[in-house]
């Protein structure tokens, strides 16, 4: 509703719960909020005394739309949904992130495999985590291999071994592939590992002690020594690991503020063990309080599909949480599970709240320092290339193919905080003469900038092309045809002998080449962005080429017609999932024998890489 008469408008608002959208003159949603009482909450924006952030927002208001909900819980869930949909500039916005990695134990296998895993939890077995990053997963994977010697190899590798691999020689596996350990003994290793993951180290030590004593009584001293070493490693690990004293799964959320910026750090407690922490730096409007940031962060984070259903039993915050019980009830309802939220600083969480806040402050300090460094580098590019305006965003394009096969264009984005990977795009090129780099570049640029003109993204200040004046001319023609203005066009071409450091730079509209010193900070950043575009293009090209060749090879397998090929892809949800599947998993597809499954598996891995 348009606000010509605020007093009359406020009287029309309902007094029940709901969500309100504040819109500007262009009809764009600039803020989304929830309320127990819509009339009372919206009225608060029309008071005389407002903080600077709210004053700036209200100066742009053209209309306010309201949505009535059945209860407060629905209001909070709908608010989170609208924030994700509209990305309003005056809300705290949590950036999209990758899904979290896990350790996956294939317990359905005769000799279960333990491995790194990221994605939807579709395969049968046990998932342990989530871990804050890939590094912590690999660290724990190495630890489990050292302690319990579980195999990590693929099914194909496992079934085709005739002698132990290097993992056995360095005592990271008991070589079930060649029968050095029987199924019963290997299952004991698996059970010990599961107890360890569940934080039941004491139970593992008791079991190992019993086995050590039996081995010693039977005069099997080498086996007894092995159990003794395992016990020592576990005891040493217990001293090093931070234990909460509880047995549940808890997230401790720390928050910190510096120079108007706000950062979060979440400590992940799983089965009583802290398995790591992860920092977050959401887009936060200037003047946002810690309490407001916390209230907006928590629903966005825990209602995101990237959580993959992994919600702790308890959330602990380092700062008081406004509407704590409301948020607790709404999240429990939306996630369909009981969830407790604690914000009081008392035992046993007090030390964890302090640690989380300290981690948030440290991470925010490093983030701001890095951001300042990137800002200086962008300023250096502006000065070195004598550009008229400051730079906040650069896009770089590159083309990759193998003799014209599976051509792919990449677009990478760099901003004031470094590489913006969520904005990367790749374009599968079609309908262009194989090997025609100009045609491929024109197609990619056209597809990209048509979308940007339609509002699907942000126009860059600088467009960087990996190539020379020919490629730069193609870019200029495309942007002129699309009537895109305000973007400075540049290119980086290889120098004599294709040697790094001798590259030439071009700016559209200037005749002369630009040669920057090899130690120039701006030159280094341009090279870094170009190399990232090259890496992204090659990776996408290799994947597309491998996919095409696998599809072609599948067509050549006797017994795989169009219907069965479609059935396979539908069963696994796509070619990538089929390529990840083991022979056993492929053989589970109705109508696929073990012999045919092996042929399919071999075809999928023939062109890998």
Swiss-Prot record:
It is found in: Cytoplasm. GO terms for biological process: nucleotide-excision repair; SOS response. Signal peptide: none annotated. PROSITE patterns: GIY_YIG, UVR, UVRC. One of its GO terms (molecular function) is excinuclease ABC activity. Residues 15-92 form the GIY-YIG domain. SUPFAM superfamilies: C-terminal UvrC-binding domain of UvrB, GIY-YIG endonuclease, RuvA domain 2-like. Pfam families: GIY-YIG (PF01541), HHH_5 (PF14520), UVR (PF02151), UvrC_RNaseH (PF22920), UvrC_RNaseH_dom (PF08459). Keywords: Cytoplasm, DNA damage, DNA excision, DNA repair, Excision nuclease, SOS response. GO terms for cellular component: cytoplasm; excinuclease repair complex. Residues 202-237 form the UVR domain. Its main location: cytoplasm. The UvrABC repair system catalyzes the recognition and processing of DNA lesions. UvrC both incises the 5' and 3' sides of the lesion. The N-terminal half is responsible for the 3' incision and the C-terminal half is responsible for the 5' incision. HAMAP family: UvrC. Belongs to the UvrC family. Interacts with UvrB in an incision complex. This is UvrABC system protein C. It comes from Coxiella burnetii (strain Dugway 5J108-111).
């Amino acid at each position: 509703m348009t606000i010509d008469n605020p007093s009359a408008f406020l009287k029309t608002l309902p007094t029940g719960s709901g969500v309100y959208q504040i819109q500007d003159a262009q009809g764009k949603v600039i803020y989304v909020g929830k309320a127990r009482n819509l009339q009372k909450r919206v009225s608060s924006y029309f008071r005389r005394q407002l903080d600077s952030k709210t004053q700036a927002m209200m100066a742009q208001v053209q209309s306010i739309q309201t949505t009535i909900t059945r209860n407060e819980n629905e209001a909070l869930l709908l608010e989170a949904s609208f924030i994700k949909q509209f990305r309003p500039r005056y809300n705290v916005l949590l950036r999209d992130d990758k899904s979290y990695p896990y350790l996956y134990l294939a317990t359905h296998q005769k000799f279960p495999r333990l491995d790194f895993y990221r994605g939807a939890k579709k395969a049968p077995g046990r998932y342990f985590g989530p871990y804050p990053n890939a590094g912590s997963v690999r660290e724990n994977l190495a630890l489990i291999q050292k302690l319990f010697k579980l195999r990590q190899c693929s099914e194909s590798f496992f079934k085709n071994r005739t002698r132990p691999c290097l993992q056995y020689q360095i005592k990271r596996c008991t070589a079930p592939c060649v029968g050095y350990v029987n199924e019963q003994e290997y299952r004991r290793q698996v059970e010990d590992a599961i107890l360890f993951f569940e934080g039941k180290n004491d139970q593992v030590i008791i079991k190992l002690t019993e086995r050590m004593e039996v081995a010693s009584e039977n005069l099997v001293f080498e086996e007894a020594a092995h159990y003794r070493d395992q016990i020592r490693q576990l005891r040493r690990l217990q001293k090093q690991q931070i234990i909460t004293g509880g047995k549940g799964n808890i997230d401790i959320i720390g928050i910190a503020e510096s120079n108007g910026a706000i950062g979060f750090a979440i400590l992940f407690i799983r089965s009583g063990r802290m398995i790591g922490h992860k920092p977050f730096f959401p887009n936060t409007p200037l003047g946002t309080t810690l309490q407001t940031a916390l209230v907006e962060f928590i629903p966005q984070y825990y209602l995101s599909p990237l959580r993959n259903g992994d919600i702790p039993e308890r959330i602990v915050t380092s700062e008081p949480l406004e509407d704590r019980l409301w948020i607790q009830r709404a999240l429990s309802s939306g996630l369909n599970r009981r969830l407790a939220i604690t914000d009081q600083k008392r035992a046993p969480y007090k030390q964890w709240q302090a640690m989380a806040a300290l981690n948030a402050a440290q991470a925010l300090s490093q983030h701001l320092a890095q951001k300042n460094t990137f800002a200086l580098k962008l300023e250096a590019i502006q000065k070195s290339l004598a550009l008229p305006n400051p730079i906040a965003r650069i896009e770089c394009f590159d083309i990759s193919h193998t003799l014209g096969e599976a051509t792919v264009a990449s677009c990478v984005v760099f901003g004031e905080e470094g590489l913006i990977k969520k904005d990367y795009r790749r374009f599968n090129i079609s309908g262009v003469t194989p090997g025609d780099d100009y045609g491929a570049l024109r197609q990619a640029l056209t597809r990209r900038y048509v979308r940007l003109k339609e509002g699907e993204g942000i126009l860059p200040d600088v467009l960087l092309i990996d190539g020379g004046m020919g490629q730069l001319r193609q870019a200029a023609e495309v942007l002129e045809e699309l009537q895109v203005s305000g973007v400075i066009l540049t290119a980086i071409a290889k120098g004599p002998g294709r040697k790094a450091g001798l590259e030439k730079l071009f700016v559209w509209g200037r005749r002369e080449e630009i040669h920057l010193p090899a130690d120039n900070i701006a030159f280094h950043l341009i090279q870094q962005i170009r190399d990232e575009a090259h890496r992204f293009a090659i990776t996408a090209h290799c994947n597309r080429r491998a996919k095409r060749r696998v599809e072609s090879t599948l067509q050549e397998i006797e017994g795989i017609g169009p219907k069965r090929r479609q059935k396979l892809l539908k069963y696994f949800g796509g070619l990538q999932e089929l390529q990840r599947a083991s022979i056993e998993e492929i053989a589970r597809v109705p109508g696929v024998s073990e012999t045919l499954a092996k042929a399919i598996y071999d075809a999928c891995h023939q062109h890998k890489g």
